[in-house]
Amino acid sequence: LLRLCGGGQDPELGKSLVELGMVHDVQVDDGVVRFTLALDGVRDVQVDLQEMTSEEKERIWPKKGQQKREPGAAEHLNNIGRVLAVMSGKGGVGKSSVAAMLAVALRQQGKRVGVLDADITGPSIPKMFGLSETPPMGPVGILPAETKSGIEVMSINLLLPSEDEAVIWRGPLIGGAIRQFWGDVVWGDLDVLVVDLPPGTSDASLTVMQSIPLNGVVLVTSPQDLAGMVVRKAAKMAWQMKVSIVGLVENMSYTICPKCGERIEVFGPSQAVHTANLLGVPLLGQIPLDPDLARQCDAGEIEDYTTDVFEPIAQKIADRASVRPGTPIF
């Protein structure tokens, strides 16, 4: 803060306010900065009140017929059928790509789909869909970005000056952003909103489970026993928060040799059945490690990726996700 204040200079002495010792009592409280500016020879200050300009009045009072936007106003206008979270526990298992493929598969079934990227410090959803433009602000709230197939997307990366800008925030700020993405974004009418959670059981996941009415969680793991161990932590968090688990998806289960067609288990034997049995949840499917998927995610063309493997997984998720047992998602 003192470094920033150093940019202000005394017009007569040509030195910064900090160098002249004019900045005192710097305090930071809940994002609000206060400090005392001590000016030599100044004993009191008089305020010259003038009439506000028309622009200043418009910022404070809405025009006739308009209402001032209140935080969370969009939430009451949204009509979202189901909210599904995708959670992994361990990073690097392809959770975000599974979330994106789920959204694409549901959209291909004719559903109205949105994706809320709750991975605030490591967002990747916009990159996969080739989105970069800042979402506009509407009269009620933020309008989500839209992919070429009509999937609505909201992510912190769409609000940053560059896609590789670091988000160095503590828990309260991260939680606040997630709540805004739910309550201040005009999602409109959706059949399903897919929420891409960050790895682990951090504040972000806790905020989602406490603030957003989830209908279920899809767990994503990989063949490694380590990934299975960590995803069990994620499952236990969901249970403690009273969020139902739709099932388990194993990603990067195997790859197919492009020359001979042999199935190769790159990360060793699958642990999916064992992990699903330990958790008592269904194994929804196993997804191969496909270089084409990686290329199309990098190119922002995940909607153009074609595979026969994920469609039955998406259908199982749609069939199982429900408000109460026995009620299908659509």
Task: Label every model-predicted segment.
Residues 1-5, 19-22, 29-49:
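Short, non-transmembrane amphipathic alpha-helical segments
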Residues 20, 39-40, 48-71, 235-330:
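C-terminal lobe/tail of nucleotide-utilizing enzymes
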Residues 75-81:
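Phosphate-binding P-loop
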Residues 82-120, 231, 235:
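Walker A/P-loop phosphate-binding motif and the immediately C-terminal alpha-helix
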Residues 92-101, 122-126, 197-205, 226-230:
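Short glycine/serine/threonine-rich phosphate/pyrophosphate-binding segments
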Residues 106-171, 175, 182, 273:
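Phosphate-binding loop that captures ATP/GTP phosphates
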Residues 154, 197, 312:
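Glycine-rich phosphate-binding loops of nucleotide-dependent enzymes
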Residues 160-208, 227:
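Phosphate-binding/switch loop-helix module in NTP-utilizing enzymes
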